[in-house]
Amino acid sequence: MFKDYYAILNITPKASAEEIKYAYKKAALETHPDRVSPSARARATEQFQLVNEAYYVLSDNSRRAQYDRESASSSAKPRQSFFSRTNPQPQSQSQQGGPSFGFRQSFSDSQFEQVFNEMMNETSTRGIANAFWTIVGTLAGAALGFITFDVPGVLVGSAAGAKLGRIRDTHGKSAYSVFQDMPAVEKARILTQFLSHLLNSSKQFTSS
């Protein structure tokens, strides 16, 4: 099935790269399965995966140009999605021939992790990153043994610094991996704070 990736991100085909990235952040935060109630999680997961498909295609100039050419073609659209045909295929596929649910979710999490780390850096002076770190410190204490750059030790609250997205613990865990291990209520709170910050930021786009 040929999917309208511009519609999925709520942007026009004329959207700039910056507008595409902003739209992805907004849509990914809105649909992230960890931000919604358990009853809405299945639907959110489906939407989150579609949002990540769209960003994968539209964030790359070459893939976007190819997608635009196929969208404009008067010939019948391919039955398989553009994402399925251009993304490296996993070993296991769904019965429909596309990537399996597990692969799509793993891909979505991996792509979102990059943006999550970026948002951690962007909000380090606005309290969200510090709130994240305070939660981590409360939950795990000194056992995590976080290291940032060349400074070892446990870093909680404001001591976490401005580069939390780069932090690894002694076992090589990224900040996003730590986030994924948080209780559901804390994950939802962090994602909602990120979304609120994005919507209230000075730079917003209207590409509808």
Curated annotation (Swiss-Prot):
Residues 67-100 are annotated as: Disordered. Residues 4-71 form the J domain. It is found in: Endoplasmic reticulum membrane. It is a single-pass membrane protein. Residues 88-100 have a biased composition (Low complexity). The lineage of its organism: Eukaryota, Fungi, Dikarya, Ascomycota, Taphrinomycotina. Belongs to the DnaJ family. Pfam families: DnaJ. This is Uncharacterized J domain-containing protein C63.13. It comes from Schizosaccharomyces pombe (strain 972 / ATCC 24843) (Fission yeast). One of its GO terms (molecular function) is protein folding chaperone. InterPro entries: DnaJ_domain, J_dom_sf. The keyword Cytoplasm does not apply. SMART domains: DnaJ. Residues 72-87 have a biased composition (Polar residues). One of its GO terms (cellular component) is nucleus.
